[in-house]
Amino acid sequence: MISVCIATHNGAHYIKEQIESILCQLGTNDEIIISDDGSNDKTIDILLAFNDKRIIIYSFKQPKKSKHSHTYVCKNFENALKHAKGDYIFLADQDDWWMPNKVEKCLEDLKKHTLVVHQAEICNEDLKPKELLMYRDKFVFKNYLSLKVGKYYGCTLAFRRELMKYIFPFPDRLVLHDQWIGCMA
């Protein structure tokens, strides 16, 4: 079973295309876990319109105020991850669009590795590539390098469930959930 974890907050602009690009790669028993941080746009309406039992939405209440706005994003992702039931966990940001073979390719590598990091393209709103995210090693950086360099993004991570026992709970002042997960691998 695959769990795709997405933290949302007012993500209506891209969420429909994103979910379409993910659903077509999932099986009937897989799931998309949405943790929504109080969206007041059409994000939830768009998600509900799919009428797909694989999309499961959880509400997320912000923790006490933090001077680090990224703390909210990290805690929102933590909420999504805590609800994931899959053997394989994928992270997605609310504005991602997945290439057609992403899941298949990641699953091949996850047979041999606990965590994989893949290449990604940063695109403009018309999906025209602006920048290619290249990694020297397509799996995971060594922990000391991850802390020093920290150049991978959650949308490029997939990992096996066994990693979950090492990542929870997220530290209270965590700023980069993706770096944390990579370092715990």
Which residue ranges define each predicted feature?
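A conserved acidic beta->alpha catalytic loop
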Residues: 36-45, 62
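Short aromatic/hydrophobic "clamp" motif used to bind/position activated sugar donors
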Residues: 89
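Cell-envelope/extracellular polymer assembly enzymes that use nucleotide-activated donors
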Residues: 1-3, 21, 31, 180
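Conserved donor NDP-sugar-binding/catalytic core segment of glycosyltransferases
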Residues: 97, 101-130
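Conserved nucleotide-sugar donor-binding catalytic segment
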Residues: 143-185
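Short, well-formed alpha-helical segments that are part of the catalytic scaffolds
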Residues: 11-24
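Acidic helix N-cap motif at the loop->helix transition within catalytic regions
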Residues: 16, 41-49, 101
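Glycine-rich, basic loop-to-helix element that forms the pyrophosphate-binding segment
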Residues: 62-84
